[in-house]
């Protein structure tokens, strides 16, 4: 099947963005990541107007939905390129754009360092031997699966890169530490930061729950983290 691939390109934050279109003639079972790799393998790479263009900048690593590096807007929805297959998308025109909530690096690459900086500010580490409650094993496992891809932040109406609100990714990852830390002073510090950087800023739209590319039980983890940090339950 022949697909038209529309890509929003931009050389840097200071330059203007523009659209380029490419043709992909291949299997509907191809992933968006496969499409991008195939386009960049062309020598030279030409757009649909016949112009020779530079390779498309995008990030990838595992290619099997394990790292979150390839997060981007696919048909205006944040998804992972490696696990989004053409047959799951409507029509023969595929639109690719960078995530909009993070500073642009180039083309489809963004700088997600604010995500990790927010986790550092929450000080999510253990200062005591972990308390392993068997009743929380399943949600702790789900919390650890988070790819930190940023899709939940992209759709969150309360998150901005310049704000204090850290978003669902912080609450999901906080759950393990809030339930494993036994040192009361450190736990109180984490709880205070959690209230400031998540609980007080969450509008409870739960758009983060529906968008998670690996289907984490985000709502459940938010509820559990809130209970642990705010009410000590």
Each language-model region and where it sits:
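A basic, amphipathic helix-loop patch mediating RNA/tRNA/ribosome contacts
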Residues: 40-75
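Residues in well-ordered beta-strands of folded domains
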Residues: 6-8, 25, 83, 97-99
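Short, thiol/selenol-centered motifs that function as redox-active sites or metal-ligating centers
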Residues: 5, 67-70, 149, 156
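Eukaryote-biased recognition of intrinsically disordered, low-complexity regulatory segments
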Residues: 1-22
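Ferredoxin-type iron-sulfur electron-transfer modules in oxidoreductases and energy-metabolism complexes
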Residues: 30-51, 92-233
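Broad gene-expression machinery/nucleic-acid interaction feature
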Residues: 2, 69, 93
């Amino acid at each position: 099947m022949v697909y038209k691939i529309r890509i929003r390109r931009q050389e840097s934050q200071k330059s203007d963005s523009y659209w380029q279109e490419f043709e992909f003639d291949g299997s509907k079972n191809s992933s968006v990541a496969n499409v991008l790799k195939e386009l960049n393998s062309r020598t030279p790479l030409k757009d649909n107007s016949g112009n020779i263009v530079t390779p498309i900048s995008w990030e990838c690593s595992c290619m099997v939905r394990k790292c979150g590096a390839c997060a981007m807007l696919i048909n205006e929805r944040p998804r992972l390129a490696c696990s989004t297959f053409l047959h799951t998308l409507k029509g023969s025109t595929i639109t690719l754009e960078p995530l909009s909530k993070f500073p642009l690096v180039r083309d489809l690459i963004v700088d997600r360092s604010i995500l990790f900086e927010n986790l550092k500010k929450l000080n999510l580490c253990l200062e005591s031997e972990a308390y392993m409650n068997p009743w929380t094993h399943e949600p702790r496992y789900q919390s650890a699966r988070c790819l930190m891809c940023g899709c939940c932040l992209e759709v969150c109406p309360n998150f901005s890169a310049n704000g204090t609100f850290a978003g669902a990714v912080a609450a999901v990852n906080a759950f393990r530490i809030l339930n494993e830390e036994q040192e009361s002073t450190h736990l109180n510090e984490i709880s205070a930061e959690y209230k400031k950087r998540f609980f007080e800023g969450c509008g409870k739209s739960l758009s983060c729950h529906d968008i998670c590319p690996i289907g984490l039980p985000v709502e459940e983890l938010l509820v559990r983290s809130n209970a642990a940090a705010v009410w000590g339950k």
